[in-house]
């Protein structure tokens, strides 16, 4: 079984979605069940409704799952596993207070050495502290694993101490809950971000202590770097939020296409998730960081907009008139996102706001003069744009840029765009909607 294990503590990050996509693809390729595990044990950081938001995004991306679990439902199991380790002398109670440990950390900082927990501290405050934590005994050997992307990763004994499994309130730590659940659901491969590399040896040690016979295979994805700063994309970067990208009008299929492409060798530029299942391989992923490129994402989104069938295009743009399909196709040629496309069609059909956009009084006068001329014309009487244009120029007494710029704004709501002769048939059939001014 493979899994994707998000925390409902904020917007879904593109790095998390990338991991979800890859786990889903490999599960499909290997004909294994796919589990979604909501890691909600950190009650203080959980945000109401974020779990549902994550699941909705996965559905939009075309990702389905065979099983959905909430980690908090397994707390009794986590405590049971901790008790097992205590009985087998693989874990121990630690009575050292948070204040004591903080002093030791400060001492290590002042002495410019890494802080490392010492097992001898476990009973120092036993008489004063009646709510101990449970720690796993530190290993006396190195922990290594062969990462499917990063190759061999090794942690020496002095890099690992006796770490906490259960907190004072008996709640499991992230690493303990994660390791227990991966064992419980027989997870065979974990694809996740490289920010989890330091968690992996701890989870391996927990699973070894609990008697895992078949080691889990790990694949840690390189981080995604911001295109301008070159630094890791954090949750503060709006483009790192999948929700933000969707709200900006990026299609789910295009986002998926992009996240599969970056740092990867792909056989074609534009593809769907189902197509990627046919050829995706972890071996083709680079071990170097990937750079986020919003311009290229827009390009891919533009290509996917062109691939939308008529029914889906009308649905996404909220247009009910099928006669406007041809116009939508023309507008797509100039749009990188669905939001841009919806704005273009809205400007075309809505009353034109010449005052708000163009405050120059001379320009306003020319617009009004041309508007009055156009209102007197029978749009259906002209066989083509050329004959329509000549009559409009004659009636308005305008020419050159004094004519063409106001004309484009009055007919499309935009000062530039698709050639007017191409969209003239749609102007003719919808002139009563098109030729309106905002009050």
UniProtKB/Swiss-Prot annotation:
GO MF: ATP binding; glutamate-tRNA ligase activity; tRNA binding
Enzyme class (EC, first level): ligase
Database matches in Pfam families: Anticodon_2 (PF19269), tRNA-synt_1c (PF00749)
Catalytic activity: tRNA(Glu) + L-glutamate + ATP = L-glutamyl-tRNA(Glu) + AMP + diphosphate
Motif ('KMSKS' region): 232-236
Taxonomy, superkingdom: Bacteria
EC number, as in UniProt: 6.1.1.17
InterPro entries found in the cross-reference section: aa-tRNA-synth_I_cd-bd, aa-tRNA-synth_I_codon-bd_sub2, aa-tRNA-synth_I_CS, aa_tRNA-synth_I_cd-bd_sf, Glu-tRNA-ligase_bac/mito, Glu/Gln-tRNA-synth, Glu/Gln-tRNA-synth_Ib_cat-dom, GluQ/Sye
Keywords of the record: Aminoacyl-tRNA synthetase, ATP-binding, Cytoplasm, Ligase, Nucleotide-binding, Protein biosynthesis
Main location: cytoplasm
UniProt key word Ligase: yes
GO cellular component: cytosol
GO biological process: glutamyl-tRNA aminoacylation
Protein's UniProt keywords contain Transmembrane helix: no
HAMAP family from the UniProt entry: Glu_tRNA_synth_type1 (MF_00022)
Subunit description: Monomer.
NCBIfam families: gltX_bact (TIGR00464)
Family in the record: Belongs to the class-I aminoacyl-tRNA synthetase family. Glutamate--tRNA ligase type 1 subfamily.
Protein name in the entry: Glutamate--tRNA ligase 2
Organism: Helicobacter pylori (strain P12)
Taxonomic classification: Bacteria, Pseudomonadati, Campylobacterota, Epsilonproteobacteria, Campylobacterales
């Amino acid at each position: 079984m493979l899994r994707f294990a998000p925390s409902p503590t904020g917007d879904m990050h593109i790095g998390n979605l990338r991991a979800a996509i890859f786990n889903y693809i490999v599960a499909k390729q290997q004909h294994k069940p796919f589990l979604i595990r909501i890691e909600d044990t950190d009650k203080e950081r959980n945000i109401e409704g974020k779990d549902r938001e994550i699941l909705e995004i996965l559905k939009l991306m075309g990702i389905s799952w065979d099983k959905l679990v909430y980690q908090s439902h397994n707390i009794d199991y986590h405590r049971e596993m901790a008790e097992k380790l205590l009985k087998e002398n693989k874990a121990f109670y630690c009575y050292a207070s948070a204040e004591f440990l903080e002093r030791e950390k400060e001492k290590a900082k002042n002495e410019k050495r890494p802080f490392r927990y010492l097992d001898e501290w476990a009973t120092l405050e036993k008489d004063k502290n009646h709510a101990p934590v449970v720690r796993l005994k530190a290993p006396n050997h190195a922990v290594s694993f062969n990462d499917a992307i990063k190759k061999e990763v090794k942690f020496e004994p002095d890099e690992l101490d006796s770490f906490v499994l259960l907190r004072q309130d008996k709640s499991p730590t992230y690493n303990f809950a994660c390791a227990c659940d991966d064992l419980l659901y027989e997870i065979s491969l974990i694809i996740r971000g490289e920010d989890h590399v330091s968690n992996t040896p701890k989870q391996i040690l927990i699973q070894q202590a609990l008697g895992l016979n078949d080691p889990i295979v790990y694949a840690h994805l390189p981080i995604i770097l911001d295109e301008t700063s070159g630094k890791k994309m954090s949750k503060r970067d709006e483009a790192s939020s999948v929700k933000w990208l969707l709200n900006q009008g990026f299609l789910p299929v295009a986002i998926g296409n992009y996240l599969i492409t970056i740092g990867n060798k792909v056989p074609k530029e534009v593809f769907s998730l189902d197509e990627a299942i046919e050829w995706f391989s972890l071996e083709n992923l680079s071990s170097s960081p990937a750079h986020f490129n919003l311009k290229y994402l827009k390009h891919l989104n533009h290509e996917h907009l062109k691939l939308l069938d008529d029914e889906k295009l009308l649905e996404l743009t909220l247009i009910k008139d099928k006669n406007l399909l041809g116009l939508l196709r023309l507008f797509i040629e100039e749009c990188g996102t669905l939001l841009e496309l919806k704005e273009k069609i809205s400007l075309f059909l809505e009353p034109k706001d010449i005052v708000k956009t163009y405050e120059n009084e001379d320009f306003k006068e020319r617009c009004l003069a041309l508007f009055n001329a156009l209102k007197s014309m029978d749009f259906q009487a002209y066989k083509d744009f050329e004959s329509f244009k000549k009559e409009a120029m004659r009636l308005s007494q305008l020419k050159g840029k004094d004519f063409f710029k106001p004309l484009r704004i009055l007919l499309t709501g935009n000062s530039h765009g698709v050639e007017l002769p191409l969209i003239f048939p749609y102007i003719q059939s919808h002139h009563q909607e098109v030729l309106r001014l905002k009050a």
